[in-house]
Amino acid sequence: MNSQFAGLTREACVALLASYPLSVGILAGQWIALHRYLQQLEALNQPLLHLDLMDGQFCPQFTVGPWAVGQLPQTFIKDVHLMVADQWTAAQACVKAGAHCITLQAEGDIHLHHTLSWLGQQTVPVIGGEMPVIRGISLCPATPLDVIIPILSDVEVIQLLAVNPGYGSKMRSSDLHERVAQLLCLLGDKREGKIIVIDGSLTQDQLPSLIAQGIDRVVSGSALFRDDRLVENTRSWRAMFKVAGDTTFLPSTA
């Protein structure tokens, strides 16, 4: 699935990634069924796998380390979100393990520019070649949006968390919409070439209004695996974007 990214420029990779509106939080499923999930997602032409790496220090939970990135099949696009105390070390390890997209927390590192600049020089393997590492910045619900201004030219993905990582306390829908509007206003003419992502315990009912506002992608985990209906739920969530006409992505009928 990721062979179409081989040899593309950073700008072309971002444009192609923007056509995929869903990143699947693969760690939310039952790990014993991981092989089945991956087969189902491949049949659906769903290349983006989202992995939350938590170290128990940045937030209370502990999930997996960079080693887990390398355990996933190379055919997928590995979308890694770092929620760790030492983002520099983790980012290097994730690149070595084959992460294609790496999103840092704005609150997690005083040396964001250094880490993002380094990531901008890295490439990772895909089927048939290599692609540049795509860089993202993520913000907790209470983090001022203007912290991203100095690094806007160093990121391709801007991710707004709708929950407080590790705690599960969610933003009110009205507050989330206001935050999206504020981000779009902040970006202004710099909106082009940026993928805006919402991550955190969204329901399908929330999607239409967020899509209408102009977001590009959502990250979803538990909602997609609910009732052991990954295929049906993935199709349904992706169809919300297709109906809205927000992307050129066409869900597979497999």
From Swiss-Prot:
Domain of life, per lineage: Bacteria
Any one Pfam family match given in the protein's UniProt record, by short name: Ribul_P_3_epim
Residues annotated for a divalent metal cation binding in this entry: H50, D52, H81, D199
GO cellular component: cytosol; plasma membrane
Keyword entries, A-Z: Cell membrane, Isomerase, Membrane, Metal-binding, Transmembrane, Transmembrane helix
Residues forming coiled coils: none
Annotated TM spans: 14-34
Active site per UniProt: D52, D199
SUPFAM superfamilies: Ribulose-phoshate binding barrel
Family: Belongs to the ribulose-phosphate 3-epimerase family.
Protein name: Putative epimerase LsrE
Source organism: Salmonella typhimurium (strain LT2 / SGSC1412 / ATCC 700720)
Lineage, broadest ranks: Bacteria, Pseudomonadati, Pseudomonadota, Gammaproteobacteria, Enterobacterales
Gene designation: lsrE
